[in-house]
């Protein structure tokens, strides 16, 4: 799984995110999800 695909592709909710992809990706870091947080 790619960190970029997992973060933006599925996001935290596992849904195809576009404009909110960035926002969800950042918040994903705090949530214990199988998504590797970047910054």
Swiss-Prot record:
Keyword set, alphabetical order: Disulfide bond, Hypotensive agent, Secreted, Toxin, Vasoactive, Vasodilator
Biological-process GO terms, alphabetical: regulation of blood pressure; vasodilation
Ranges for region Disordered: 19-39
Expression tissues: Expressed by the venom gland.
Proregion positions: 1-8
Annotated disulfide bonds: 12-28
Subcellular location: Secreted
GO molecular function annotations of the record: hormone activity; toxin activity
InterPro entries: Natr_peptide, Natr_peptide_CS
Purpose of the protein: Snake venom natriuretic peptide that targets both NPR1 and NPR2. Exhibits hypotensive and vasodepressor activities.
Name of protein: Natriuretic peptide NsNP-b
Organism: Notechis scutatus scutatus (Mainland tiger snake)
